[in-house]
Amino acid sequence: MGLCLRWRRLGFPLPGFRRCELHTVREAPIPTPPHWLAERFGLFEELWTAQVKRLASMTQKKARTIKISLPEGQKVDAVAWNTTPYQLAQQISSTLADTAVAAEVNGELYDLDRPLETDCHLRFLTFDSPEGKAVFWRSSAHVLGAAAEQHLGAVLCRGPSTESGFYLDFFLGKERTVRSTELPTLERICQEIITAAQPFRRLEASRGQLRQLFKDNHFKLHVIEEKVTGTTATVYGCGMSVDLCQGPHLRHTGQIGALKLLTNSSALWRSSEAPETLQRVSGISFPKAELLRNWEARREEAELRDHRRIGKEQELFFFHELSPGSCFFLPRGTRIYNALVAFIRAEYARRGFSEVKTPTLFSTKLWEQSGHWEHYRAHMFSLKPPGTDGVDSSQSGHPARCPKDTLALKPMNCPAHCLMFAHRPRSWRELPVRLADFGVLHRAEASGSLGGLTRLWRFQQDDAHIFCAPSQLEAEIRGCLDFLRSVYSVLGFSFHLALSTRPPGFLGEPHLWDQAEKVLQQALEEFGEPWNLNPGDGAFYGPKIDVHLHDALGRPHQCGTIQLDFQLPLRFDLQYKGPAGAPECPVLIHRAVLGSVERLLGVLAESCGGRWPLWLSPFQVVVIPVRTEQEDYARQVQQCLQAAGLVSDLDADCGLTLSRRVRRAQLAHYNFQFVVGQREQSQMSVNVRTRDNRQLGERGLAESVQRLLELQDARVPNAEELF
């Protein structure tokens, strides 16, 4: 009875019932709330009450005036351990108080209702910022978690925000799965939690208290043992739901204006060897219902632009079960692929990069030396040479090492480039050494994550590595950023940058990290494009700049990267002779602009909706004879185009009217149609039309071919308008 009272007080509907004006009606059976839900909530309430008392005592003992620096130089006074960011937002404007989702205090993300402790720089985050969206969607995942615990008796595993929404992984037992028919009920319960405007309450708990709170959740216990390295960690309460989370979160669930659950699927805990199969439900949410409607309209447009659909309709590529995780590029798709690679090769030549070719198959000794065998082994394909009878590594007494005869397909090029740098003595006069490689890579992604061109087992990258002196680092980073801007502007992408700094378990000297992060930050500030700071999100071997490009529908994609590496030069003992004659260690920069060429091609297909710009297009020109009598001349025109290296087709189906054939060419997204009749044949000319049905009139054949070549070489996005 006590649980039911708490349930009603917190705004939850009683399980299995719905309220009616005249009577209560039994719905389809819903699992009784698990016993641990009330036990955990009771312990949370005890710990929360104790924390409130500690905070009140702290306020009395340490209350003092502190200075808060706001953006644009404004400063205000506040009371330590008392004033919250939300209270300051109310003082500034009611609009800010209503739209802020979290705060940033001295670079740290902060709950709006968490008291400020000392002098600080304060910035408010709204849904419009990437950080604000992450907070908003993380809180939405917690709402879904509360609904899943209530309705399904779920054991929660993880519920992160993503670049395009959120998802929740949870366990229902070995036999139970989530059905798509259950999503509307889950969504309704989420909406009831939102309507109740339940507060998110932040609690700091000791490791012992954490174990007690989550004693019935072995997933959380595993995370506590593995990830909680300090004496305390944070949990958040939302209604009766309690979850382990760093936060921050929204002030209350009522800030979520609209929430929609999208898909249900299965997921794995940790690895394919784990016995538990998790259930995953993904969703999206917004501060206002209007934003959800706009998103749904964009989603419908995105479905029409799905690269898998375009690839099939335009005969660009296909997939086959006999080669999972790999793409078969047909002639038209190969044309686009090669044009992208040629574009990057031209930039390499202009920017002083040297293209190299390295093997695909290496002894695992290389990967042990680089550290990938220890940290990345689960994502690598390994095999034994024919005729060897070595013991499988999984059966040996040393699982971290592999027998001498074991080989592995390379998942990245950097170790091979280190071998290439080290194969002969180097001088400071050679630096920087910029090595570029389009070598085939293989990564063993989980089969469930494979989908179209976005995630493959076999792919190629515009992968390059720069070996430079520390004094050259700043100039090289500026060059990498300029490379990004040049390529993305041609491809029609806007982009956002994020600087990820040292994580807790970083390797190397702190002063080297300080210097490198300072160089990256200064380069970003001078670059002038939008960027944000991701504290602690760098790789263990160096800070990085992540590049998030935005396509024509405004969707983010992470493709390019600029990564500093302090460890590989040490692991491979890379040296060059410095100006004083002493050996010195180079700095290594990993960088990619397109990232996976396959993935970028898929992003481009969806961004342009299959209407390829001329320089990429596999449908540059179709030649259409008016009558059968002009078919020979039409073939002559086609041969002239092909001789110039342009892509051309011939539509000599004179059984259809001219207007039907022109319309067919426009629907197929041919950039240009060259219509040839008796007059054009006599004048050695063509009548030019565009895919947007602009009639450009009669032009000389040689002149038209030359103009197409000029527009193709310039890589303009609007050749039809400039012709």
Swiss-Prot record:
UniProt-recorded name of the protein: Threonine--tRNA ligase, mitochondrial
GO cellular component entries: mitochondrial matrix; mitochondrion
Places the protein is found: Mitochondrion matrix
Subunit text: Homodimer.
Listed EC numbers: 6.1.1.3
Annotated TGS domain residues: 64-126
HAMAP family linked to this entry: Thr_tRNA_synth (MF_00184)
A biological process from GO: threonyl-tRNA aminoacylation
PROSITE patterns: AA_TRNA_LIGASE_II (PS50862), TGS (PS51880)
Matching Gene3D superfamilies: 3.10.20.30, Anticodon-binding domain, Bira Bifunctional Protein, Domain 2, Threonyl-trna Synthetase, Chain A, domain 2
UniProt superkingdom: Eukaryota
Signal peptide extent: none
Residues modified to Phosphoserine: 57
Keywords for the protein's UniProt record, in alphabetical order: Aminoacyl-tRNA synthetase, ATP-binding, Ligase, Mitochondrion, Nucleotide-binding, Phosphoprotein, Protein biosynthesis, Transit peptide
Record-stated family: Belongs to the class-II aminoacyl-tRNA synthetase family.
Species annotation: Rattus norvegicus (Rat)
Function field: Catalyzes the attachment of threonine to tRNA(Thr) in a two-step reaction: threonine is first activated by ATP to form Thr-AMP and then transferred to the acceptor end of tRNA(Thr). Also edits incorrectly charged tRNA(Thr) via its editing domain.
UniProt GO molecular function: aminoacyl-tRNA deacylase activity; ATP binding; protein homodimerization activity; threonine-tRNA ligase activity
Root EC class: ligase
Catalysed reaction equations from the record: tRNA(Thr) + L-threonine + ATP = L-threonyl-tRNA(Thr) + AMP + diphosphate + H(+)
Top-level taxonomy: Eukaryota, Metazoa, Chordata, Craniata, Vertebrata
